[in-house]
Structure formats: C-alpha cells, structure tokens
Amino acid sequence: MLQYKPLGRQATVVIAGELDHFAAPQIRRMLDDVLKDETLLHLTLDLENLTFMDSSGIGVLLGRLRILQSRGGTMSVMNMQPPVEKLFRLSGLQRVIGIEKTHKGGRL
C-alpha cells in the first residue's frame, strides 16, 4: 500500500489502492512515521496506483502538509489518475499541494 524512498531532505512515497475512510488511519500512521524524520522538508506522493480518494484522504494529506509546513517544508503529488485529479481540483487542493507531471528523479 505504501512504498518509501528517501533522498536527502526529500522523500517520495507511493500510495496504492484506496485512500478512504477505512484506509485513512493506516496511511496516516505510515506517513507520520515517514515525517518523524524532522530533516525531511519535501514530500512527494506518487499516486499512480491510487484508484480512489475521498474526504478522509483529503484530511490525511492536509494534516501531513501542516506538519511539513510547520518546519518550512512542502508537499507535492504526481502521477494522479483522472478521478483523483478531479477530486484535487474540485476541492482546491492544487492551491496548497503542488502537482508534478513526472517525478524529477524518475519513477520508483
């Protein structure tokens, strides 16, 4: 469900499956474990294999963004499937979470 690739002060996390009410607590815990590294300043979420996300997922992402922002960091997403990208745009998430078309370092 989640793969993690650190690279200096940034990391890429691959989230797969669904990010809904049922999966949100587990994904939140996993992302919080990644963010325990306080030197991490940028988190990229690779959502290529994320098939569904609801408001619970939005909450998870915004909560982790707040953690990063509290230390001067940022978050971005990449490789979104059309339904997830539509939710991003309808909810306005693209205004606070950057959208990358491809990862700078290549795919995981």
Give the role of each language-model region.
Residues 1-51, 66-108:
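STAS-like cytosolic regulatory interaction modules
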